[in-house]
Amino acid sequence: MLKAGCNIPDVLGNFKYTEVSLHEVDYRVLYTGVASDLKRRIWTNHLHGNGGNSTLRKTLGSLFGYQKIARDKNYQINKKTKFGAEDENSLTAWMERNLLFAYFANDKRNELESFLIDSLLPPLNVEGSKAATLHRVHELRCDK
């Protein structure tokens, strides 16, 4: 979630956010996801990983216009990309200042994710999203 008073580049044109209130503070929902180990996923992949192993990082980095580079030596086969070290570090710092991660355990995580995507329309979700920004998010994330 995007913290109050924080923004991301609106290169998608007219970002529409759903706001949620936690402890009487409003946050704008950007993304929702599932994982078998959310703490590891958030800490290792999203906050301290790279754009090659985090959909959230790849999308945010693409919004910031960061240059994509080959993720590993298998690029010719898998076409996976990430961002350069300086951009990855800048993205990590931005995420730590501007985002709040909220999570909870649930036995039906896939159903819950579908429900949250359908009802909150997070603009940065790619799979399963009906958000108006979906096509543009795909374009920005496209590995060229």
Annotated model-derived regions:
Residues 1-90, 94-144:
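GIY-YIG nuclease catalytic motif and its immediate N-terminal context
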